[in-house]
Amino acid sequence: MESMILITAPAAEPVALADFKGLLDIPLTDTSRDSTLLMMQLAAREAVENYCRIALITQTWLARLDSFPSAPLRYDRNGYPQVLLPKPPFQSVDFFKYVDTSGAVQSLTRDPSYGTNLAAPFYGYQLEPGGGIMPAALSPPWARPWAPQRMVPANTALQYRCGYGGPLTVTMTAGSAVLSSPGFTFNPDDAPQIAGDTGTAINVPGAGAAGAALATYVASVSNGIATLATAATAAVASVSAWQGNQVPNSLCLAILFQAQFFFEQGAVCDQLEPRVINSLRNGGYRNLVS
């Protein structure tokens, strides 16, 4: 039986509370209903994510399977026994483990050589990271099978990060491109079991010239610490940076109108949703694959 377990929830919401209050004509100084509004925002974001079958803000999930997949019959002998990761956009794999025939837990590592590196472990996986609403696909290295397994429930576990992007608390020193983020480990491109965070967009408030934001990207990763492509002009300490891409504006608007609908109709409602919500979330953002 396949199951999905949320390991790390989003650290923020795509829509600011102030924007939601503005839509409802509630003064920012009126905080009497903030807890209700935040609950409606969360419910609206989850409704949009569940409908589109994607992840908006960075989150970590654990997928548990009862076995590696077999090749779909419709592909005959040219089939690809792929693991398709739900909730795109994909970011990186934390680990990929399975129970071998002796009952021991083993880790699979990524083979970026597509099976041409004979020195690589025989059992591993290839990664096609997908993009946008297309899910990542993991398959055995070329001309190799998945590893033999002991047939017990939940004998395969894959933990991964997904979402367009999310907030990250960081510190930078003036003149340095090193990004310090306690408690967060960046994934290097040469690590065996992940796609790599090199090239990920980073926006650090206050670290640019004249107090502006430093908009750059991860140039390299060493021991889990990222070095950016551009050094900080000013020092910043424990500021909330943004790692990755921004959530598409259409989906943010869909969340706003969905939250407004929940707020105005109440917790129990059988009314049809406004057409504008369907139009916004159907605008090329629905994952129909995994």
Predicted segments with their positions:
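Divalent metal-cofactor coordination and adjacent catalytic microenvironments
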Residues: 1-175, 179-198, 205-290
